[in-house]
Amino acid sequence: MPSHLALLSCLLVLVLSLDKFLLPYLRKRWLSGGGVAAIIPRIPTSHFKSQRSMAAAAQWSETTMLVIDMQKDFVDPAMGSPLLVAGGEAVIPAVAEAVAVARKRGIFVVWVVREHDPSGRDVELFRRHLYSGGKGPTVKGLKGAELADGLFIKEGDYKLVKTRFSAFFATHLDSVLKTLGMKNLVIVGVQTPNCIRQTVYDAVALDYEKVMVLTDATAAARPDIHLASIRDMKTIGVETPTLEEWRR
């Protein structure tokens, strides 16, 4: 009992102290015109900005950008390739800008390219007739397989070779990304109804949390086909911002 009485005495002294010193101070601050803001200190907006920046940085560290098929045989008309994507050349600047933003944010950049045997034996059956004479599209070591002018693989980036439409088909891409803890994908390149679309559908099937296609950093042979493919991908939960919307 004596200990309980001592505790009660201490609490009583504390309450009286608050009444004598703190309450008059708060009353004075309130009456001075500051209201609640005068009593409760403002948290600097920089604090919230810092928290948002930290959250964004954490998200970017779990994000990969896939740059798909931005090779000369697909996007450079001067090559005369039978697989030229008519809208490909126009999006080269947007792809370059998207890659620059990704690198600045610390996003892992993967360059997905086709490189085929000169014989064409590793290409889809319906395209093998293009490889007579060992000079088919994107043959390994030939100029057509190079990245478009203005696009470069830099230290820290990753190059992935595929021989089919999807970047995930018969490659180790999913293994690499999951090992690195990647959860989100941002996709740019060509072309929308084929390699972009199949890669996206495989990514969704593989349970990547967020899959995003930058609509003006991707292209197809025709604008209507591009837009139709974008609409289809939106129906399965794929995000489709423009480059400007994504970079904000």
Predicted features along the sequence, with ranges:
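Active-site-adjacent betaalpha module
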Residues: 2-64, 97-105, 128-248
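N-terminal nucleotide-binding beta1-loop-alpha1 segment
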Residues: 64-70
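Short acidic, Gly/Ser-rich segments with clustered Asp/Glu that frequently serve as metal-coordination loops
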Residues: 71-77
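Active-site loop/turn elements of alpha/beta-hydrolase fold enzymes
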Residues: 70, 114, 216
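Early exported N-terminus immediately downstream of N-terminal targeting peptides
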Residues: 109, 113-132
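A short alpha/beta connector and helix-capping loop motif
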Residues: 61, 79-102, 106-114
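Active-site loop signature of alpha/beta-hydrolase-fold enzymes
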Residues: 73, 117, 220
